Amino acid sequence: MKSFSNIDFSKLSLIDSIIATSQIIREDFPTKFVISDLYNKVKEAKFYISSEIEPNLKLKKLLKLFYKTWNFGAASGIYKLSDVLWIDNVLKTRQGTAVSLGILFLHIAQELKLPLNPVVFPTQLILRADWINKKKWLINPFNGEMLDQHTLEVWLKGNISPTAELYEHDLYKAESITVIRKMLDILKSALMEEKKMELALNVSNLLLQINPNDPYEIRDRGLIYANLECNHVALTDLIYFVEHCPEDPISEIIKVQIHAIEQKKMILH
């Protein structure tokens, strides 16, 4: 596994950061294919929007190309969540999630010098375009459609809390590292659900290099180790979580798991 510490996110674009982290997680990640396919898509998009002068019209045309002509969009039918997160797979199937589709569209738009940025909204990634006249567009990466304030408020109330309110900071531009962390969080959960524990462990270790002392991430790594029957290191991580988050209701469940692992160790010895 390559060293995560060698990645300088401040010098890499978002897409290059995602490619670099994907290479660390998956030995079979097809970097050459991804770079080549993205290069060709940027080239095609540049030609497709070249007839427009105004940036807002260029962006509208790019949305049409990405979601209608190329037919990128939300996954349908039966699928594994990790399959719609891996960038190489999304490029092949053209089916993704808000975060994977958003990262791809954002890369193409930024290569074409369009004023588009990521926003890590409480419910999903969205894209934000800021225009000279102070107007902004908020775009849903699932389908390329514009989002209004009412829709965002409905999302908050339906997914977070019936009393949740929309605040200005909910729509602030996100730094690349925040988007990467969001994607890795979702990917780790998907891989744990799919019982791909070795890959999930790689993701967890990446997240811990971003935020080394996060007790929740240490807890998740402990749960992954427990699944892999690496009981000694699992105990270290799970005990760390219980000690640092004693008030968290999950701590009681983790204590039961710690006891079960300790009992197993006693039986083995």
Curated annotation (Swiss-Prot):
InterPro entries hit by this protein: SirB1_N
Cited NCBIfam families: PRK10941.1
Family named by the database record: Belongs to the UPF0162 family.
Protein name as it appears in the record: UPF0162 protein BUsg_167
Taxonomic source organism: Buchnera aphidicola subsp. Schizaphis graminum (strain Sg)
